[in-house]
Structures are given as C-alpha cells and as structure tokens.
C-alpha cells in the first residue's frame, strides 16, 4: 500500500473539532487511556470479514503464577502486539489470542505454599494476570481464550494421549528416573538443569518407578532434519540439534572372559578398536553387580550406591573422574586382548548401551581416567604415521594414519572411520548403528494438579485406554492434594475414583493415578485457539487449513528443548493421523531478551528485584511503559531495567503532545525541509520495522519529533500533513504501525 493512500485512509484530520478540543489540555494519560480503551472494546479494530489473508501472531501463554506479571513478561507481549498491529495495518486479519497454561508444577506449588486449593488459586491468579494483560492495550482476541484446566480443553489433551497409545507411542516402563525430592515427582531429562529441578532448584536424585513414556525417539530423525526448514534463531536450532544428538558409528560386542556374557558398546570411532585398552560401564548397567569378584564386591556395591544419589548433570560435569575395577575382563574382539572392566559414573546408562570401550590415546576423558588408574595407553592414529613418545595428552585430531592396528596399519583414519562399521559387521562381532542422545519422554507425574492419564489397568486385559466417547476423564476433587512422596499421586487415595470397570471385559479394574506433566497442554494449545468451542473435534480440518500454522511465535529461549521440542513432536504426530496438514507448528520464532534487575540479575521474588507494571501504569501510563519496553534495547538482547528510562519516555510523550497541540490550529504551509524529514522517517522506520529493530524504530521517532520541535520554533509552525503523519502513529502513519496505542487513538 502506497504511503499516500495509507495517510489518506488512516491519518487523523487536524481540522477535526473534537480532536482539537481533546488536544487543548496537557497530556493526562489516565484520562486518555480510560477513554480510548473503552472505545476499542466497543469497536474492535481487528475483525475477520472473511476476505483478508490471515496472519497468526502468538505469544507463549503464561503460567498463572501468584506473583502476576512483571515488566519482563510485558516485553514479549508488547513486541507481539506491535507486530500484530503492523500486520493488521497491512491488510491482514490477525489471529492474536491469549490463554492460560494452568496445570502442572508452577500452579500446584503456589497453591501448596499458600494453603489454597489449586483450582481456587489458579482461577484467582488468572483473573489478576488477565487484568494486567488487558492493561497493555493489546489487540488480543479474548473470544479465542483457552485454559488447559478446562475439561473441554483437556478432553483433547487426553484424546491425543489415547491416539498415541493406540499408535504404540505411549507405553509404561519401570526405570530409574530423575526425582525431585522437593516437588516429590519424577522429571523429564529436559526438566533437569545443571543437576537441579528447573522449577524449585532442588538437587535431583534417581528413583526407580513405573512411568508412562512417550516415544519421542520415533520422531528423532524428522525432528532433527526438519530444523533446516524453520525460520528460527540458529541458537535454538542448534540447541535442539545437540539435544537430539544424532551420531553414526557401530555397536561392538565384547565377550566377558570366563563367562557366558557379552557387553555391547556403541562407538562413533570403530576405527580405533585396536586402541581400546579398557571398558567402562555405567554403575546402573545390568551386569555391573554380577561382574564383581569376591575381592571387589564391596567396593563395587558401595560405588553403585554412591552413584545412584547423583544426577546425570553432576556426573558429566565432574572434573575429577572416579571409578572402581570390577575384577572382570572382556576380550577385544579384533585382537583378542583382555581389557579390564571398570565402573564409572561419567558413563550414563541411558546413552548408547550404558557401556563404552575406552581408547585413552585419542579421548580426553579416557586419557585422564587411564592416567589416574594406571591403565595402558596405545596410540593407533598418528600424524604422518609417527607415534608420539611419552604422551602427555590425548591425540584428538580427526585425521591421521593408522598405527598399531594390525591389518589396518597405513590406512587413513578418516576413511577407516566410514568403512569400519561394515567391516566389523562382516567379521560378525558388531553392526552399523545410528545413535541419539534424545531419550523417550518421561510423561507421568506423581502429582494432583494435572490431566488424568486416560488409562485403565485391568488384571486380564492389561493397560486399556479410556474409550474416546468417555473423555474427558475428569480430575476429581480432593481434600489432600499435596504430593505424597511415595511414588503415587494423591489420586491413588480416592477409592471411588480409582475403582472402575474395564472397557474391554467389564471386570473390576483401576484407573491410572499419575497425571500428565505441565507440558501436555502447551504442546498443542496453539491449535485450539482457532476452534476453541468445537465439542466434536480438537480442531476442524476446515479451520486448521484456513488459520494454521502459527506464522510468528514469540517467547523466551528457555523453552528451546522443552516446550518447543515437544510442540514439534505433537504437531508431527497430529499431522500423521490427519488432524492437520502441516508438520511444524511455528513458521517463524522470535526469542525476546530478558528484562533483568540491577547488575543483570534475573527478576525474582526471592531476589526482591521484581518490577510490577501496575504502579508504572498508574504513574506513567500504558503508552510510556510500552514505549520504554521497546526502547530499552534490541528486542532479542537482555536489558537491565532502569526507572529513569521510563521517566524520560514519559517526558518525551509530553513534548510530543505539546508539539501537536501548539500547531493543531495553524494553517502552516509545508516546506521542503518538513517534506524531507517526513519522507526520511517513513523510509527509516519501515526498514527498521521489517528488520525487527524495534528499539531503533522508537529512537528514530524520537529523533524525528525533536527535529520537528526545533523546526517549529525556527519557522513558526508545522504543516498539517506532517502533523497528521506524526499524530497517527507516533512513528508516522504511513508505516501503518501503532506503537503507542491509546495515545495514537487519542490523536485521531
């Protein structure tokens, strides 16, 4: 749309009498914002007439925490609203909904802390945060609102689980899981950060429990390969790629000397097999205890117990390697040499096979371990074929010539690395293998406040899904909702709810008492917004085809390997069963930076540095806060909050208001200089907007306004065309963007 046409259609008219009257008084944000907010509620500007192309701009919906929103939350919401208005003024019908991620640990922990039932505290918190979000003056469509705790919503969360169960993607397994002793529940690997619970920061331990799992590994290749087609920050794509961790190598079988057992290892460097001088097993390996001899048994059992109390993260980060010799040996299948079998907690049971062959000459960790425990080191790759005398560190160069490797001597390691898997397979003691760091998703939680898992346990039929026409399985009311810590959720104590009949055979059976994690609803909620009142389908195919997927998704980078990965998994599954015709949920992703307290410290109640928007709106107004949130720095970068900044923005708004007020009734002719300034603003701001440089859009508008103030003083006034450009959007009406929403509307 050309600049002239936008200005003609949208710019305020300076000669309008009511506008001149409103402008006559000094800028009073309370009066202005109250008036125009009511006007917008009565006359929405984002209406679907069925003729416009859609643009779906979505925020990551919030947890309804008791502390409400702080200015850091506001930043993402302001950014998304600016972008939504920009698209709206370019002729799109903008889908811009909001909802509540209200099940799970955050809401339940708050309820327990305050002694209030989570249903009550969650409803209260939602009401408070909704009020705060409405204060942003954003164009959210509240008719699309969703709440993950609404039975009409979680009916479909349960439906997805049933479909996954029928597809073989949901299964039950007893296994050692991450256990938070404070939250008293199991955690997925993605919920453990630096060895601690990502919610309460308690040190995570291990606990053997029967768990429901989702087979996200079945989608590992697609999740990894499809990253290439996403317009996402490279940082996020790399984080997901590293988390999935696909590697190519071989599985090799080592027979245990003197026993009818073998140990399978996974290695990405089968070319170095001649250099394998010892083996290390994870303490949790199924053979760990049985490999102990009479002489080593006590030390082995003590080491296994000690390792069980430590998190995987702690084990991987330890600089000091620990271990214990089992007393047993394995046979290197390539050269027949005996290699000692050790246990060490730097090997993880859930990666590869839980056992590794150790080539200390060419791996830093193995070298350190060998030096500490005086194990042999044999170099098998050398630069130019020359062996290093008295190695002081591992030779880890990727390329070199094979030495001390029998028939493989003289081969280039880079070539042998590719050929060795097939050679080993032909020799009969191994096979080619693609491996992944990604593990299946631990999906059940031993908590109350979550979606009941729709499974019935029948003594005869086994695990049976609740029939789809009987969904939702409602979360029952309880008196005691606190976690038990026993490995069972509080639901297990409700006999009248637990005891039921099997849908298959009609005999007495019991309901599953674990609940789903907080990520269950958020993995698909973005689909429901566009058809949130549909009682028969998760989303109709007609609306899915018309309004989905999400075009722009805005939220924090902290969800890179949690929500964002899970949402991609769910979307691919729903695509595969025909619910939607796309397999990626979010076409473009923008991660806004964090607003921190002083000295870059993250805002939190415990630090006492949370800045609430409520008082700022009262003192400075919504527009001043919105503008400062944009001005504070590049939107993708972290920024430190400074109260002096919003004070300066508020003073600037007053100067702008005065500029228009003083010139509203003047019939001043435009000059070459004002035309030049106006056109330059349009060009600069448009370019910056398209590049998402929102902070420089604001600074450019400030610069533009200051030039007009100086020019007004110099030549005695500013012409109407220039004022209309400025007044409409505070960043030029020809940009079709409305940064300072209520002030802009006031100036119409």
Task: Describe the residue ranges of each PLM region.
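Conserved oxyanion/phosphate-binding beta-strand-loop segments in alpha/beta enzyme cores
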Residues: 24-60, 88-97, 121-128, 232, ...
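Residue-level signal for inorganic ion chemistry
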Residues: 40, 101, 164, 168, ...
């Amino acid at each position: 749309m050309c600049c002239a046409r936008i200005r003609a259609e949208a710019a305020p008219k300076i000669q309008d009498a009511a506008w001149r009257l409103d402008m006559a008084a000094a800028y009073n944000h309370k009066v202005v914002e109250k008036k125009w907010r009511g006007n917008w509620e009565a006359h929405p500007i984002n209406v679907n007439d069925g003729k416009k192309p859609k643009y779906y701009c979505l925020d990551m919906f919030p947890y309804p925490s008791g502390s409400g929103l702080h200015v850091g939350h506001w930043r993402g919401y302001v950014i998304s609203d600016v972008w939504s208005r920009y698209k709206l003024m370019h002729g799109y019908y903008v889908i811009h909904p909001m909802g509540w991620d209200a099940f799970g640990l955050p809401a339940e922990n708050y309820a327990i802390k305050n002694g209030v039932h989570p249903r009550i505290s969650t409803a209260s918190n939602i009401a408070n945060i909704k009020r705060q979000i409405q204060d942003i003056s954003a164009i959210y469509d509240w008719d699309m609102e969703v709440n993950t705790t609404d039975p009409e919503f979680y009916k479909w969360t349960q439906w997805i689980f049933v479909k996954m169960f029928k597809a073989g993607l949901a299964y039950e397994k007893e296994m050692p899981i991450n256990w938070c002793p404070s939250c008293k529940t199991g955690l997925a690997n993605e919920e453990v950060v630096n060895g601690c619970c990502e919610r309460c920061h308690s040190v995570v331990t291990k606990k053997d429990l029967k768990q429901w799992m989702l087979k996200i590994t079945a989608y590992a290749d697609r999740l990894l390969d499809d990253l290439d087609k996403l317009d996402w920050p490279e940082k996020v794509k790399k984080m997901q790629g590293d988390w999935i961790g696909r590697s190519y190598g071989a599985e090799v079988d080592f027979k245990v000397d003197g026993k009818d057992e073998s140990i399978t290892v996974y290695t990405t460097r089968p070319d170095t097999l001649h250099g394998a001088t010892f083996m290390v097993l994870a303490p949790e390996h199924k053979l760990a205890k049985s490999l102990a001899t009479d002489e080593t048994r006590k030390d082995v059992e003590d080491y296994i117990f000690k390792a069980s109390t430590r998190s995987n993260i702690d084990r991987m980060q330890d600089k000091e390697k620990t271990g214990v010799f089992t007393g047993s040996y394995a046979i290197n299948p390539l050269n027949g040499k005996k290699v000692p079998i050790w246990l060490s907690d730097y090997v993880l049971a859930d990666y590869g096979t839980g056992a590794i062959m150790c080539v200390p000459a060419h791996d830093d960790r193995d070298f350190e371990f060998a030096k500490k425990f005086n194990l042999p080191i044999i170099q098998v790759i050398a630069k130019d074929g020359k062996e290093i005398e008295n190695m002081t560190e591992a030779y880890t160069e990727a390329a070199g010539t094979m030495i001390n490797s029998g028939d493989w001597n003289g081969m280039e390691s880079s070539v042998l690395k590719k050929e060795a898997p097939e050679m080993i397979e032909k020799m009969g003691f191994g096979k080619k293998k693609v491996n992944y760091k990604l593990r299946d998703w631990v999906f059940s939680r031993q908590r109350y406040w979550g979606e009941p898992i729709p499974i019935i346990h029948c003594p005869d039929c086994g695990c049976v899904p609740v029939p789809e026409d009987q969904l939702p399985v409602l979360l029952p009311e309880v008196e005691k909702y606190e976690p038990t810590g026993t490995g069972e959720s509080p639901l297990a104590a409700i006999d009248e709810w637990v005891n039921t009949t099997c849908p298959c055979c009609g005999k007495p059976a019991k309901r599953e008492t674990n609940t789903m994690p907080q990520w269950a609803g958020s993995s698909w909620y973005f689909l429901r917004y566009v058809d949130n009142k549909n009682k028969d389908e998760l989303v109709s195919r007609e609306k899915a085809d018309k309004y989905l997927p999400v075009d722009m998704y805005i939220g924090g980078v902290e969800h890179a390997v949690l929500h964002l990965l899970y949402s991609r998994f769910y979307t691919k599954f729903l695509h595969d069963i025909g619910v939607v015709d796309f397999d990626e949920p979010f076409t473009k992703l923008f991660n806004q930076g964090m607003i921190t307290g002083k000295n870059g410290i993250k805002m939190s109640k415990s630090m006492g540095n949370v800045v609430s928007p409520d008082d700022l709106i009262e003192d400075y107004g919504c527009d001043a806060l919105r503008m400062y949130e944009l001005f504070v720095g590049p939107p993708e970068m972290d920024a430190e909050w400074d109260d002096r900044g919003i004070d300066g923005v508020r003073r600037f708004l007053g100067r702008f208001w005065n500029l228009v007020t003083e010139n509203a009734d003047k019939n001043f002719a435009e000059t070459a200089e004002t035309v030049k300034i106006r056109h330059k603003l349009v060009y600069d701001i448009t370019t910056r907007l398209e590049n998402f440089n929102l902070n420089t859009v604001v600074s450019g508008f400030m610069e533009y306004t200051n030039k007009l103030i100086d020019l007004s003083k110099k030549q005695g006034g500013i012409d109407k065309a220039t004022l209309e450009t400025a007044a409409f959007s505070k960043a030029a009406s020809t940009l079709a963007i409305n940064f300072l929403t209520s002030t802009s509307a006031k100036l119409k």
